[in-house]
Amino acid sequence: MCLSTVYKNKMEPETIVMRNVMHIQCKDGCVILTDLMDRQVAIEGTLEEANLVDGFVIVKEK
């Protein structure tokens, strides 16, 4: 199982949006994140980068 930490705009500790993300969906200009506990966060923006080997995702906020 590949779990990732999602960051907003840049990869820095203070920009972490969610950890242990297991599902990412891009829909209607939003990136919807779901973690292991089935919690969801929606960010208005686009998926900028996803590195599943290193376990990080960067979402560019609008």
Question: Where does each model-flagged region fall?
Answer:
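Compact, glycine-rich, soluble single-domain proteins
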Residues: C2, V6-K62
